[in-house]
Amino acid sequence: MSASAAPPNKLPADFLWGFATASFQIEGATDVDGRGKSIWDDFSKIPGKTLDGKNGDVATDSYNRWREDVDLLVQYGVKSYRFSISWSRIIPLGGRNDPVNEAGIKFYSDLIDALLERGIVPFVTLYHWDLPQALHDRYLGWLNKDEIVQDYVRYAGVCFERFGDRVKHWLTMNEPWCISILGYGRGVFAPGRSSDRMRSPEGDSSTEPWIVGHSVILAHAYAVKLYREQFKANRGGQIGITLNGDWAMPYDDSPQNIEAAQHALDVAIGWFADPIYLGQYPAYMKEMLGDRLPEFTPEELAVVKGSSDFYGMNTYTTNLCKAGGEDEFQGNVEYTFTRPDGTQLGTAAHCSWLQDYAPGFRDLLNYLYKRYRKPIYVTENGFAVKDENSKPLEEALKDDDRVHYYQGVTDSLLAAVKEDGVDVRGYFGWSLLDNFEWADGYITRFGVTYVDYDTQKRYPKDSGKFLSQWFPAHIAESPKPAAETKKAATPSPLKPHGAISNGVSKKSSATKEPKSASRKKGRKAPFARFTAYISAFLGL
């Protein structure tokens, strides 16, 4: 059903909604069942790298509690779940000639089967920042284009081969801007490289982020090439990339600030979106960086352009933009939340970079659709309530500021689709669970479900209840065959403030192992052809 065919004030019947997570933020079990280290394992244990000094060794223990998390998704009534695969759980040493870890394959295969059995569509991210440590040690990871592209494409091919019979929605990368700028520019994310010698013993913030971004684009594009040439014809499905970027509003009506807002969008979004969808880097980035911005060969550009079936949009806030900034990572634009009259743009979140401003969400949807002309999936969007981590449980569950945020965003989403004609096909709230929030440790909470990190009990917040009611009320119904209706999972009513602890849903927690047919889907397959094929189409 198209958006235009849906009833008034309804999203189309095939609209996907759900929640998102990332492997390192929730799984824990970092040294279990053959998993290799990622760059975040040791980095998060370096004193001062996380606000609370904690790491991801346990996180929300979802490697062991994934059935409980699936129960929670069913209780919320979601149609889809976006999660990421840990590269070093699949290929512990990461490389194209390194062995595949069958225990890692089985873990994700079982999760995918369980989701499908409960009527939930898996929406899978291949890379959410957890590069195998071995690849960083061998050749500095994303800084070595020739090596990393081959290794990433082989990893992607393994996932397509082993899971592609069941996964029909793929994301190659999560937020390349963060990979590049926060990991190799500011040095606050793994691997923590920066020109600031107080922060990092090595790195060059003036060159490395742009090299890394270039490598990420090429790895994405060649993985998509592999998918389209080797898998799409037989298995169908969609593949794309998810890019972060917040709406940029001019601070006032002055020409220089209007131009500054566009420059902010060029660097935050256009850096990656323009080559992928339009076939070239933004002119402003070329002007700003000169020869520090790598160039694509004609052969590479032919692979890069058009290498995403849709636009994966991660967004959280809106920035007011002034000309005259000195931060290249922001396009030499100054960001502020303070209007000319001294008022704030919106309610402040716990993190300083986020305020609630729903109109900007609608503006960004319109901008992306008009500029890139691709269907949009909102792959991440959420809010961190101020000081939520220090609140008593009952108070934390009444997350009014997060509810207000989602009320505004969902209203803007509906208006963008129904009034503006934007083709939005899905929405994923961030996040299903409170979790390891990277450099913030566990202090900043984005979940619609409260996690007691001492007991690992899960407690739905009011925001989760709101979304679980809003989307069913605003998605058009589609008739289903009687047989299919019988198979569909019926979500239990979601009660606010109810604890979901390990084993509380005994029927599901005691779920037997997947049937032999399901196990066969995760069985070992030949991979030698991937290496030969990858080398051939990369010209290496």
UniProtKB/Swiss-Prot annotation:
Induction: Expressed in cellobiose culture, but repressed in glucose culture. Optimum pH is 6.0-6.5. The active site is at E175, E380. GO terms for biological process: cellulose catabolic process. InterPro entries: Glyco_hydro_1, Glyco_hydro_1_AS, Glyco_hydro_1_N_CS, Glycoside_hydrolase_SF. It is an enzyme of class 3 (hydrolase). Its EC number is 3.2.1.21. Residues 481-524 are annotated as: Disordered. PANTHER family: GLYCOSYL HYDROLASE (PTHR10353), LP05116P (PTHR10353:SF36). Belongs to the glycosyl hydrolase 1 family. This is Beta-glucosidase 1B. The gene is BGL1B.
